């Protein structure tokens, strides 16, 4: 090629790169949504046509996990991990000690916006986002009567007022208004945080999708009662239903829960439609995830204060430019890997304290692996290690260990820990768990100083659960 032609080609390439629009992000975050509540990912009962649309447009992770919690309200650390990119042992739950990823997007020239649930304290909102509307600053409420505030330009919140609509619907309204206001001069990062399908499972009167409890199958790992004391047998969530768990009551709860998921799905559809109709459809990444799963009858439990798959595994769907279409990935990752991945895709420099591993290679080729193992924790009561096939859960306070072969037993119904042929595996996994915990700054012992009996007797009377914080 002659020199003049080479110069012309190089100039054209430079102009093309300069003209390429920056990548936008629309992040939708649910609250307590099990990974198995999406029709396109295998649930034959639930109706989620819009989440199904998103699944077909991108990559759905089948082994994405939250890492655990330091108290019953696991939403708090889960959101802190997501937004900071830091592990459970290393987070500041109030998000004040470390730069958040939304702040990093803002520093990179992005317009940043949040709407919906914020469970990490008011001071961290202006540290993370430039604009925020319809913020529910708390853990849980009746979503038809939720107190919400807007963030003023000063960073202060307006006095709270009762949302005139269902909180998830109004937060979606404000997100759509933000998207409509974008003029293309700056890329944007939008964060829509639902407070559902967290209980109470309330949707607007007249919402047309309904489920008959009799039509809802029980979870494959349903039990009337958990077989031993896991350390949190009477936490608020577990008081939502009497013991032993009646099958009919579990089906009714699941019917209400599925209906709430379907209501959220409608809001997801509104966001997808808005992005599709916008001038920035081709350069916008859409992410759907949840802060945790929840038991809802699995293993005799109702809540999320446990380390079983139904509570730790979360939906994670990513779609957008350069991302594979209609693919599943069994790469293992944490929720706190998601923001580093988005940063990599968008060219945003990571906060210096972010610890997550970016998984952008998986989004291009879903057959690629991510993390070789994952570890989990709930208080000092439960610790776990998952190497992709084998999962060990340790309960120090009762000196009990469980071992599951997730490949053969994905619902964790067959505890293999007592079988002699697995003794060496358990020994090695306990050693690995202990060393990895120590390396991450988790100094909880794997054997408690005081061992209590594993046998547990249910209360004859169920206390009325409080509403605070969960």
Residue spans of the language-model regions?
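N-terminal secretory signal peptides that target proteins for export/translocation
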Residues: 1-3
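Bacterial N-terminal signal peptides
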Residues: 5-16
């Amino acid at each position: 090629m002659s020199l003049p032609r080479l110069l012309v080609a190089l100039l054209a390439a430079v102009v093309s790169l300069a003209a390429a629009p920056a990548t936008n992000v629309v992040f939708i975050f649910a609250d307590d949504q099990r990974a198995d509540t999406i029709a396109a990912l295998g649930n034959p009962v639930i109706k989620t046509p819009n989440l199904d649309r998103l699944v077909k447009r991108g990559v759905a992770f089948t082994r994405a996990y939250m890492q655990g919690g330091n108290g019953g309200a696991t939403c708090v650390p889960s959101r802190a991990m997501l937004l900071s990119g830091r592990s459970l042992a290393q987070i500041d739950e109030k998000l004040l000690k470390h730069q958040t990823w939304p702040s990093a997007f803002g520093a990179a020239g992005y317009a940043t916006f949040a709407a919906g649930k914020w469970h990490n304290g008011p001071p961290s909102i202006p540290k993370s986002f430039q604009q925020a509307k319809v913020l529910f600053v708390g853990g849980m409420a009746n979503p038809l009567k939720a107190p919400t505030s807007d963030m003023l330009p000063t960073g202060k919140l307006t006095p709270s007022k009762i949302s005139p609509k269902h909180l998830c619907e109004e937060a979606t309204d404000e997100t759509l208004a933000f998207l409509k206001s974008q003029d293309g001069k700056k890329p944007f990062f939008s964060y829509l945080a639902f407070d559902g399908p967290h209980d109470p499972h309330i949707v607007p009167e007249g919402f047309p999708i309904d489920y008959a409890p009799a039509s809802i199958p029980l979870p494959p790992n349903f039990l009337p009662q958990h077989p031993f004391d896991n350390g949190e047998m009477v936490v608020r969530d577990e008081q939502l239903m009497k013991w032993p768990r009646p099958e009919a009551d579990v089906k009714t709860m699941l019917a209400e829960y599925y209906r709430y998921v379907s209501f959220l799905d409608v809001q997801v559809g509104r966001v997808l439609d808005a992005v599709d109709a916008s001038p920035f459809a081709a350069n916008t990444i859409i992410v759907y995830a949840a802060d945790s799963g929840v038991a809802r009858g699995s293993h005799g439990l109702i809540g999320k204060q446990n380390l079983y798959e139904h509570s730790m595994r979360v939906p994670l769907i990513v779609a957008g430019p350069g991302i594979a279409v209609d693919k599943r990935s069994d790469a293992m990752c944490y929720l706190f890997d998601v923001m580093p991945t988005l940063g990599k895709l968008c060219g945003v420099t990571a906060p210096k304290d972010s610890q997550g591993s970016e998984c952008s290679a998986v989004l291009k080729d879903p057959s690629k692996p991510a993390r070789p193992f994952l570890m989990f924790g709930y208080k000092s009561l439960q610790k776990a290690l998952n190497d992709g096939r084998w999962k060990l859960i340790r309960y120090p306070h009762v000196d009990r260990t469980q071992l599951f072969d997730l490949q053969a037993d994905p619902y964790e119904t067959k505890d293999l820990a007592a079988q002699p042929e697995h003794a060496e595996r358990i020994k090695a996994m306990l050693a690995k768990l202990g060393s990895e915990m120590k390396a991450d700054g988790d100094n909880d012992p794997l054997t408690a100083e005081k061992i209590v009996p594993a046998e547990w007797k249910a209360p004859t009377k169920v206390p009325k659960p409080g509403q605070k914080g969960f």
